[in-house]
């Protein structure tokens, strides 16, 4: 439980502030975040959440969202720190492998390699060589594997930021690049829907569909 982990860290080391990226998840992560927020307030710890994508919290209206998204994406890219001060005395324990968790081996020989340098290489290769095929290739599983950007994992894990991907993309031109940039916009647009309407995880998005699915 994350609150128990944070509390142990607070007692052992002391915590002056809590920093994380701003996440739009599901109902479970939302309840978790509320418990973390309550824990932080109880101990007088400031919790700073850094926006990960072009999603805005607590919007009263969707009017002007696209203009706000463009403004967020146009902001300067924050440079990476030269170094991070390590915290000594933390034992992460043994990271369990699949047999310990009673899971079968996850054999995936063509799994993508993680890391920022590989993510940047994937982005460059897409924009320079594969983007021209993107509008035609994205819809078929036979061609999407090589015709799409393959950046989802790098965006999800924070190896690349949405802002730097879009800004890099706008140094290139062509129909494929424009189509790709539209999908980046849609990515944040649909996450914004979940941010604004978290209940759609548990109910039909369109009210006319209520009752069609049997529980």
Predicted regions and their residues:
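Trp/Phe/Arg-rich N-terminal binding region typifying the photolyase-homology
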Residues: 1-84, 176
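Long, charged, mostly alpha-helical binding arms that flank functional sites
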Residues: 215
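Glycine/tryptophan-enriched, flexible segments
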Residues: 43-45, 64-212
